[in-house]
């Protein structure tokens, strides 16, 4: 039986503001708050909210038959928490239907997987904890930034304990093979690989409303037939796309949501089921390893890193950013960590691309890739200065790590002592209350009987007063005072 693996990504980058050379050292805030609020609010209203409501309706209508998967970047979660919490509430409502699986990905939606394995592990752990706190589930399958995958990345992900990973069904890696099978990492067979079908995925996300497309207009019945016509021995078709394809890339007026809501019925008529990534990793056997020497992605015709690292400016910017990666990770300063996450986001490098077809010409506030490069490098100059001021270059990473570990251990000891003091205070307070309660509960003691009055004693006779002695007048002397 053939299964559909339907996956949506939610990512929003943090927009940077105009930052000039003379701002370095004086202004440590790098973000365009107005544009961040405007873009996330617009995307939520026109795409995320109506799309999630449609998916909830599908889950309630089709029950356990319908299933899908989601991943969210950390930057997207932070923006949604601040400006559009309704999206997270709808995701939680969808989660309660039992039809959705949440995947892990790097917190920043950056390139730590190819630049710093330790930073990559740290980011994935932080994002997994965030997903657990929001939805109460622990991700078991990983999706990398931009669907990036290579053998080395796969081995790293397997080492972290994930059972599966999503990847692009790129021609340069598949060759004659089909993306409709389950493969495994060439360096570690424990990691199963689910490969995106680029053609069928982009029929929905990119071509659905293209009036010049020879298949326009696309109906759910036609699309379900295309999937059913795939060879019967091919067990899975992976449809991966950004959630904003529903409402932004393909406007709501194109009836994209009506197409989506009609699709499960048509697929069921063709004997096709839905399955989550974890279910497929458990149910299907790998047909063999998939060697991927160089990283692949789901962007542009080349399906490689060229949209982000295709020119010398992008490479220099990424190298400069990761020159302080270990110090930021080891140091753990919250403000630096937050800036680090935002500056890593892949969109910052894509604005610097000189490829004609990259991003469709959209560059945000920048007039050219060189303008984007200058602005980004100015911000990096200030950011790196702050890192070096807090963690001087004279201290190497091992020494810094040892120093911060000592400080942390001392802080932990103080915290333990504070907790012990609080426990003793609580114990003393409880004992005092118990003693007071016992005193109040005890019956009042009866007063002691008075001793009988002693009989009155006969007063003793008064002693008679002795007669006063006769007064002897003082003899006065004569003329000489009695002197001889």
Q: Where are each of the predicted segments found?
A:
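Active-site and substrate-binding clefts of carbohydrate-active enzymes
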Residues: 2-46, 181-191, 210-211, 225-430
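Short, well-structured secondary-structure segments
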Residues: 3-8, 14-116, 140-143, 163-168, ...
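Short, solvent-exposed loop/turn segments at secondary-structure junctions
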Residues: 10-13, 74-78, 107-110, 147-150, ...
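Generic structural signal for well-ordered alpha-helices
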Residues: 52-56, 88-92, 121-128, 154, ...
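Acidic, His- and aromatic-enriched active-site or binding-groove loops in soluble protein domains
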Residues: 87-104, 137, 158-179, 183-195
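CE4/NodB-like, metal-dependent polysaccharide N-deacetylase domain
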Residues: 119-146, 225-240
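Alpha-amylase-like alpha-glycosidases and glucanotransferases acting on alpha-linked glucans and related
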Residues: 175-226
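Long, low-complexity, intrinsically disordered segments
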Residues: 440-484
């Amino acid at each position: 039986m053939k299964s559909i693996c339907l996956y949506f990504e939610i990512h929003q980058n943090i927009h940077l503001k105009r930052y000039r050379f003379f701002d370095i050292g004086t202004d440590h805030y790098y973000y365009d708050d107005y544009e961040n609020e405007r873009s996330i609010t617009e995307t939520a209203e026109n795409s995320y909210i109506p799309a999630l409501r449609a998916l909830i309706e599908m889950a309630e209508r089709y029950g356990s038959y319908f299933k899908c998967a989601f991943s969210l970047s950390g930057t997207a979660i932070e923006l949604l928490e601040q400006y559009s919490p309704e999206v997270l509430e709808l995701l939680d409502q969808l989660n309660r239907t039992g039809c959705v699986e949440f995947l892990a990905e790097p917190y920043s939606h950056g390139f730590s997987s190819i630049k710093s394995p330790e930073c990559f592990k740290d980011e994935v752990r932080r994002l997994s904890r965030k997903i657990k706190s929001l939805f109460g589930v622990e991700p078991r399958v990983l999706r990398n930034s931009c669907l990036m995958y290579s053998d080395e990345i796969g081995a790293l992900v397997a080492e972290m304990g994930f059972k599966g990973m999503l990847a692009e069904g790129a021609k340069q890696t598949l060759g004659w093979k089909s993306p409709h099978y389950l493969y495994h990492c060439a360096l570690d067979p424990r990691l199963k690989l689910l490969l995106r079908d680029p053609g069928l995925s982009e029929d929905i996300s990119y071509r659905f409303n293209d009036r010049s497309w020879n298949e326009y207009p696309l109906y759910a019945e036609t699309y379900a037939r295309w999937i059913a016509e795939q060879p019967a021995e091919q067990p899975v078709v992976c449809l991966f796309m950004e959630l904003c394809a529903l409402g932004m890339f393909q406007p709501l007026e194109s009836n994209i949501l009506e197409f989506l809501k009609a699709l499960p019925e048509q697929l069921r008529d063709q004997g096709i089921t839905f399955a989550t990534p974890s279910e497929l990793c458990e149910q299907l056997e790998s047909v063999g390893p998939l060697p991927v020497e160089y990283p692949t992605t789901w962007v542009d015709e080349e399906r490689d890193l060229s949209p982000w690292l295709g020119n010398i400016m992008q490479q220099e910017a990424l190298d400069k950013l990761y020159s302080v990666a270990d110090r930021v990770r080891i140091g753990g300063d919250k403000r630096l960590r937050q800036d680090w996450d935002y500056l890593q986001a892949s969109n910052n490098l894509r604005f610097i691309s000189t490829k004609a077809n990259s991003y469709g010409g959209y560059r945000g506030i920048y007039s050219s890739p060189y303008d984007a490069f200058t602005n980004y490098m100015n911000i990096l100059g200030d950011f790196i200065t702050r890192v070096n001021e807090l963690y001087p270059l004279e201290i190497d990473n091992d020494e810094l790590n040892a120093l911060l570990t000592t400080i942390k251990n001392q802080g932990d000891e103080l915290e333990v002592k504070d907790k012990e003091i609080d426990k003793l205070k609580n114990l003393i307070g409880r004992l005092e209350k118990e003693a007071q309660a016992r005193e109040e509960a005890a019956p009042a003691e009866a007063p002691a009987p008075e001793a009988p009055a002693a009989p009155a004693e006969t007063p003793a006779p008064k002693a008679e007063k002795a007669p006063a002695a006769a007064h002897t007048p003082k003899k006065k002397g004569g003329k000489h005072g009695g002197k001889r």
